[in-house]
């Protein structure tokens, strides 16, 4: 049994090269202790011995994108040979001692259309004459076999029989034309000729390859990819391996002309010839499980949500829930179980509690715990509610009082969960994709959201649920335009949405054409049909004293002299709601992330960073312009850019502060005016107080399990198309205990999900 997850072997005489732990290794074909020959610790693919066995070429992601590298075994020196920057590149083998064969789509506009090339040891690249392909094998006699390109071998597309399955084309020595191997209509008893075929090589005058063409549905769906061969004319098909489900798919067979190696389920196998039995190569890497590693504070810092007063924030950090005070103090781990993943932690109003979604119970649930780290009611553990009733939680939003939580499920349901009782109530359902933009009225009576009209990419309408109503949600806008991001103003008088209702075309700069670029504005509708719009002229004029009174009240609040805020009561007249919508007095643009703050609203104005390709800023020095945070005050009746650089932000529960994130910096600023970095009202949050060590395999096990739940939850048929999904997960889960990198995990996930084909 190998001590790791071993892949992509190649052989030369009695030496095998393979990949493990994101590096290249060498081991005798008889097995034993392996030697690491690279130390880059990046994903690597397809190591290939040169004909003399003195060099190894391979694909490495050391430069972020896959490129061809070569290693001299005598000196240990490695060199990068290509600088293509393509999304795909596969090292295939050696044309001769000085030229390496690879495939890449770098000269096409189709990432899936790879062509065959050679690169010399001095970096000269030439395209081969064989057309598109992802593999190439040339026999000593000059017979040529190529494989048509696609996204991967059959281990990722198990039992795939579509038009892009890899097919082998043969050209006999001395011939000019290629012929396709195993064509439709030919007599191949019990073989599905539409299956993909991969990993070609020549041995004893025969062409070997791997394929799952023995899996003929529905008779034997569990048949694995095996090693097959044909003669130089594409006839005399033979099967050479008989792997079961426990052994796995035969993958990436390679031969030096006398011996064959391949891998399956992270194990290496060797065959001394076509008629020999395949034996497992026992390899000892000499490395243990990946050690616990510290996590950077901004690594997978997914979300930041403020508490009520803006004194601290709940963070979703690498699958855990943390509470971090904004000005000094330690970070508190509220839920950091390595076997579970936490999502969307948020404060429950001014209760001192937080809530988040967690898969700790296998099915999603909500967890509730105190922000001081004492758990729920000093138990030291979070309280779990609604387990198994929520589906896969996509979004959640607590009510202002913290007594209810709105949840959007993967199946389109909009749910209300009582924090006290855990009771779940369905209040809406989006039949065309997920609902988004959950928002409560200040009194917690109304819940609004956006849902698509005809499909996830179509226009969206605003829906509302009234706690005092009959229980059914109702539609506020028709969805004729794309309405999104609804929010109630803090005074409970208005509902504001972002809506793409501006149709002011611009001429194209290259052709005689018109397009609609900036279509979005914030729009407002009074909840009450008798409430006037806050915009436009009024007979009495707009009072200056209102602004002065608002400033005086803000100063009194800051001094602690204010009385308790008056209770806000909302009353929504749904009839004629859309007819009451009026635009804010701002120019249409590209806006997102609308939110209500005290005495106003804020949103992000997206900067003009040029086109999709980046050519508009080619040669421009400095950073691209950043998105800005814009504030509109109802009392001042003016718009102001209060933060010049923002990626995301959160509003404190009282609406008085904003927690702003830009790149790796987080700061707290007032919600209604701009402050400099030196202003006492500007607080830079020290993220270095976030400290945590994670054990990689614990995370990888959680990722594997969550992926299994996601597939079961989202699969297009309830019966999983007859696949015993739990049995599949049980078969592949032990492989996670052998992996040493996240790239290994991705490989296992590809194989696991491929079982659903």
Q: Over which residues does each language-model region extend?
A:
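A short helix->beta-strand "capping" segment at the edge of beta-propeller domains
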Residues: 1-4, 34, 286-301, 380-382, ...
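A flexible loop/linker signature enriched in serine peptidases of the S9 family
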Residues: 19-25, 40-44, 59-69, 82-89, ...
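Predominantly a core beta-strand signature of beta-propeller blades
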Residues: 33-36, 76-79, 123-127, 167, ...
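Conserved blade-ending motifs and adjacent loop-strand segments that build the rim/top face
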Residues: 238-252, 341, 474-485, 588-592, ...
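Extended repeat-based solenoid scaffolds, especially LRR ectodomains
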Residues: 305-311, 547-587, 595
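Beta-strand-rich domains and repeat architectures in extracellular enzymes and scaffolds
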Residues: 1-27, 299-322, 585-607, 611-612
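Intrinsically disordered, Ser/Thr/Pro/Gly-rich linkers and terminal tails that flank
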Residues: 582, 593-596, 605, 613-757
């Amino acid at each position: 049994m190998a001590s790791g997850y071993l892949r992509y072997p190649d052989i030369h005489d009695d030496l095998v090269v393979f990949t493990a732990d994101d590096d290249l290794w060498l081991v005798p074909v008889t097995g034993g202790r392996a030697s690491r020959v690279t130390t880059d610790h990046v994903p690597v693919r397809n190591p290939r011995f040169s004909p003399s066995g003195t060099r190894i070429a391979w694909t490495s992601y050391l430069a972020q994108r896959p490129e061809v590298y070569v290693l001299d075994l005598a000196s240990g020196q490695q060199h990068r040979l290509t600088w293509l920057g393509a999304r795909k590149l596969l090292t295939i083998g050696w044309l001769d001692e000085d030229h390496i064969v690879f495939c890449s789509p770098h000269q096409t506009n189709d990432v899936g259309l790879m062509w065959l090339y050679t690169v010399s040891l001095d970096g000269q690249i030439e395209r081969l004459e064989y057309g598109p392909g992802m593999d190439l094998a040339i026999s000593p006699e000059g017979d040529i076999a190529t494989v048509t390109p696609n996204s991967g071998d059959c281990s990722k597309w198990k039992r795939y029989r579509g038009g892009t399955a890899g097919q082998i084309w043969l050209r006999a020595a001395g011939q000019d034309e290629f012929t396709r191997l195993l064509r439709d209509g030919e007599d191949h008893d019990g073989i599905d000729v539409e299956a993909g075929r991969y990993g070609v090589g020549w041995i004893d005058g025969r062409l070997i390859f791997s394929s799952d063409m023995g899996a003929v549905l529905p008779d034997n769906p569990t048949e694995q990819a095996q090693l097959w061969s044909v003669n130089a004319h594409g006839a005399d098909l033979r099967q050479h391996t008989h792997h079961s489900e426990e052994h796995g798919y035969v993958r990436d067979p390679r031969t030096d002309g006398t011996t064959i190696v391949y891998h399956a389920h992270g194990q290496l196998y060797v065959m001394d010839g076509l008629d020999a039995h395949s034996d497992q190569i026992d390899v000892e890497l000499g490395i243990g499980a990946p050690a616990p590693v510290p996590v950077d504070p901004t690594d997978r810092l997914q979300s930041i949500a403020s508490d009520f007063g803006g004194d601290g924030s709940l963070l979703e950090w690498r699958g855990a829930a943390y509470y971090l005070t904004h000005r000094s103090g330690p970070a508190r781990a509220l839920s950091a179980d390595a076997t579970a993943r936490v999502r969307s932690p948020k404060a429950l109003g001014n209760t001192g509690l937080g809530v988040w979604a967690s898969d700790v119970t296998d099915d999603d649930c909500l967890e509730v715990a105190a922000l001081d780290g004492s758990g729920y009611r000093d138990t030291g553990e979070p309280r779990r509610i609604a387990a198994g009733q929520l589906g896969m939680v996509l979004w959640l939003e607590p009510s202002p009082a913290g007594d209810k939580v709105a949840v959007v499920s993967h199946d389109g349901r909009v749910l209300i969960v009582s924090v006290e009782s855990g009771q779940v109530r369905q209040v809406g359902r989006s039949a065309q994709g997920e609902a988004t933009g959950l928002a409560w009225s200040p009194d917690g009576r109304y819940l609004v959201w956006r849902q698509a009209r005809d499909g996830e990419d179509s226009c969206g309408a605003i829906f509302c649920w009234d706690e005092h109503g009959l229980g059914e949600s109702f539609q506020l806008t028709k969805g004729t335009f794309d309405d999104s991001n609804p929010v109630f103003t803090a005074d409970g008088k208005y509902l504001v949405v972002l809506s793409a209702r501006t149709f002011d075309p611009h001429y194209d700069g290259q052709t005689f054409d018109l397009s609609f670029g900036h279509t979005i504005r914030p729009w407002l509708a009074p909840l009450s049909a008798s409430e006037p719009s806050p915009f436009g002229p009024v007979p009495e004029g707009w009072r200056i004293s209102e602004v002065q009174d608002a400033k005086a009240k803000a100063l009194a609040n800051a001094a602690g002299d204010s009385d308790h805020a008056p209770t806000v009561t909302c009353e929504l007249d749904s009839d004629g709601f859309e007819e009451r919508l009026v635009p804010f007095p701002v120019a249409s643009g590209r806006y997102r992330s609308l939110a209500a703050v005290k005495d106003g609203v804020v949103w992000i104005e997206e900067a003009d960073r040029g086109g999709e390709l980046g050519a508009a800023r080619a040669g421009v020095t400095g950073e691209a312009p950043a998105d800005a945070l814009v504030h509109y005050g109802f009392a001042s009746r003016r718009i102001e850019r209060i933060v010049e650089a923002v990626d995301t932000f959160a509003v404190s529960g009282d609406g008085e502060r904003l927690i702003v994130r830009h790149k790796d910096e987080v700061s707290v600023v007032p919600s209604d005016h701009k402050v400099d970095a030196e202003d006492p009202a500007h607080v830079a949050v020290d993220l270095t107080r976030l400290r945590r060590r994670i054990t990689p395999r614990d995370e990888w096990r959680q990722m594997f399990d969550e992926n299994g739940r996601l597939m079961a939850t989202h699969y297009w048929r309830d019966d999983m198309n007859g696949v015993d999904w739990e049995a599949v997960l049980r078969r592949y889960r032990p492989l996670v205990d052998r992996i040493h990198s996240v790239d290994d995990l991705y490989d296992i996930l590809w194989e696991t999900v491929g079982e659903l084909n």
